[in-house]
């Protein structure tokens, strides 16, 4: 490690979520500019539901790394916005399945374009090779630290 030097402030900025926070702020701003009233957190839930509709809140927690109270709050807000509905599982009445509404489904194309555009803005000036290395480093950090 002695010969390896790194920018400790940059490392902790990444690990503390500052990069993620900056991208989320930009994404939220870009959504609002296009008239889409969702947060980046809500978008990650929609993303999971666009991939597989009708999943449990626990599945959404696992997919988004959110705790149960945070997920409940997010889904409550998304129900008020008519983006999702909770329906009791026919096999297990104690479990609610979360489904997209028509409004939630209609956001997929436009919001995905905005997310891709935001990501392109964030990655401006970064080569494909740098991206591959960065992804691999972050993947290893995640693997080393996940519970």
How would you describe each model-predicted region?
Residues 21, 25-70:
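N-terminal helix-turn-helix DNA-binding core of bacterial DNA-binding proteins
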């Amino acid at each position: 490690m002695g010969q390896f030097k790194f920018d400790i402030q940059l490392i902790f900025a990444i690990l503390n979520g500052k990069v993620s926070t900056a991208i989320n702020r930009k994404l939220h701003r870009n959504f609002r500019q296009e008239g889409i009233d969702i947060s980046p957190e809500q978008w990650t839930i929609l993303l999971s539901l666009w991939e597989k509709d009708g999943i449990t809140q626990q599945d959404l927690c696992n997919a988004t790394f959110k705790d149960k109270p945070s997920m409940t709050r997010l889904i409550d807000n998304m129900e008020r916005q008519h983006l999702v509905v909770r329906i009791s599982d026919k096999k297990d009445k104690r479990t609610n399945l979360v489904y997209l509404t028509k409004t939630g489904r209609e956001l997929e194309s436009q919001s995905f374009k905005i997310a891709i555009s935001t990501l392109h803005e964030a990655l401006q000036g970064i080569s494909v090779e740098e991206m591959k290395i960065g992804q691999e480093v972050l993947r290893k950090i995640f693997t080393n630290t996940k519970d």
